[in-house]
């Protein structure tokens, strides 16, 4: 992972969990070269860099470890976090990682992302009464009946009505239309941090065509 503009004065932290393209060498040998990885969130780093806001970026591909997925509540399976197939149904791995490898990958990539994000948010809370976490994504609007900006709030559990309205106004002033929680309501990142005191969180999905 990497951080862009770690020290800023604003109460905003941006998370980009799905732009990573790295496949570590020890993992690459397990991968199926024929698999597609089309739903990487392209160009988001270029979008946020001019904003000069504190941003955490996952550098490892979401097709290796998806840091926005929920851990299973029971059992030890990590399939939701370490996917098995691509969008076309192709196996992502010639040899799906053993349980021990799965645990190791989560320790290397999943847990550190949350710890680092928590540290960035706590640092902001030392200087601000409230902090906003934006979990930034992009989506292929050819696959959905919309090209709106999607604001995910976990059914309005992670974001106050006032902040949601402010965000909608900001996008509308730029000529952009928005939808709330449809078709994306947000993943584990906003679910984890959006329920914490003094932190609001929103998942923002930007269409590829924008």
What are the residue ranges of the model-derived segments?
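N-terminal catalytic or cofactor-binding beta/alpha core of small enzyme domains
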Residues: 1-133, 138-210
């Amino acid at each position: 992972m990497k951080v862009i503009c770690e020290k800023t004065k604003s109460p905003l932290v941006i998370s980009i969990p799905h732009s990573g393209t790295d496949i570590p060498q020890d993992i690459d040998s397990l991968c199926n070269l024929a698999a597609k990885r089309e739903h990487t969130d392209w160009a988001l780093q270029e979008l946020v860099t001019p904003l000069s806001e504190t941003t955490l970026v996952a550098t490892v591909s979401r097709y290796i470890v998806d840091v926005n997925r929920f851990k299973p509540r029971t059992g030890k399976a990590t399939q939701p976090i370490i996917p098995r197939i691509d969008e076309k149904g192709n196996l992502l791995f010639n040899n799906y990682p053993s349980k021990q490898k799965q645990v190791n990958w989560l320790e290397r990539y999943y847990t550190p992302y949350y710890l680092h994000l928590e540290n960035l948010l706590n640092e902001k809370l030392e200087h601000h009464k409230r902090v906003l976490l934006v979990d930034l994504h992009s989506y292929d609007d050819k696959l959905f009946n919309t090209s709106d900006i999607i604001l995910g709030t976990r059914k309005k559990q992670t974001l106050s009505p006032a902040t949601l309205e402010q965000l909608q106004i900001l996008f509308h002033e730029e000529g952009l239309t928005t939808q709330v929680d449809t078709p994306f309501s947000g993943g584990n990142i906003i679910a984890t941090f959006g329920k914490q005191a003094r932190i609001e969180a929103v998942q923002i999905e930007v269409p590829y065509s924008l």
